[in-house]
Regions:
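Active-site cofactor/cluster-binding pocket
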Residues: 55-114
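Short glycine/serine/threonine-rich phosphate/pyrophosphate-binding segments
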Residues: 13-19, 82-86
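Short, glycine- and charge-enriched coil/turn segments that flank and shape catalytic ligand pockets
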Residues: 30-32, 65-67, 95, 135-140
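Glycine-rich, phosphate-binding/catalytic loops in enzymes
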Residues: 22-23, 91-94, 117-118, 171
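Acidic active-site catalytic centers that drive phospho-/nucleotidyl reactions
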Residues: 12-14, 78, 103, 156
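Short alpha-helices
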Residues: 102-172
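Hydrophobic helix-and-loop "lid/oligomerization" segment in the mid-to-C-terminal part
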Residues: 1-9, 17-49, 53-56, 62-66, ...
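Short acidic, glycine/serine/threonine-rich loops at helix termini
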Residues: 17, 46-49, 88, 111-114, ...
């Protein structure tokens, strides 16, 4: 299967964490996977495993259009409306590939064959973890994938300072730690990098 993962304009930690976490899992299933994003993402997320292979639509639109057109499956992560992927909306809508929405925002639009929407869950990265486990594939989550999923969960809750009171989140963190992630190092890479992007995220 040829699988394309797309996420929203100006991708944040959860957009990239969920996309890369899903990519690392799908690669263990021997799938051909590409991530396409509409535009640039912050420098403080470039360390994430697999980030260097992400395709920017604003730079490589012709190549991206080919991948989207030829995809068997298009996974739409961390957005609830086609307008959120900017210029990519038209080729994604036109593709014959089966579209799957996986998101945690309210009121998803009806543009995918399958919609997995859980606004009660704090991040799309957490949702990806839950889906992989629901399929019985926890063993196939790699350390690299776990690092990406943890980053998404951490950034979408402000370092677990809001929207993070469910016990399940901390159970999931313990499961990700069992994969060998260093959560303190991940925190330093994301929150102690004082770039312009970082300062903007801090408010």
């Amino acid at each position: 299967d040829k699988i394309v993962i797309v996420t929203h304009v100006s991708p944040d930690g959860d957009a990239l964490g969920s996309s890369l976490g899903l990519l690392h899992f799908l690669e263990t299933q021997e799938k051909n996977v590409h991530i396409i994003v509409p535009n640039a993402f912050p420098d403080f997320l470039r360390w994430m495993p697999g980030a260097k292979d992400i395709i920017r639509y604003d730079k490589y639109s012709e190549f991206a259009d080919e991948l989207i057109a030829e995809a068997d499956v298009i996974c739409c992560l961390d957005f609830n409306a086609l307008s959120r992927i900017d210029a990519m909306a038209k080729p994604v809508a036109a593709s014959a590939g089966r579209k799957v929405l996986i998101d945690h925002h309210l009121n998803p639009e009806d543009f995918c064959r399958v919609t997995i929407s859980h606004p009660e869950i704090s991040s799309t990265s957490e949702l990806i973890f839950r889906l992989i486990c629901r399929m019985g594939n926890f063993e196939d989550i790699t350390r690299e994938g776990a690092e990406c999923l943890y980053t998404g969960m951490m950034t979408d809750t402000g370092g677990f300072t809001y929207n993070s009171n469910s016990r399940e989140i901390y159970f999931i963190i313990s499961e990700l730690l069992s994969k060998g992630i260093d959560k303190d190092e991940i925190y330093r890479k994301v929150f102690n990098t004082y770039s312009e992007d970082r300062l903007r995220l801090m408010g």
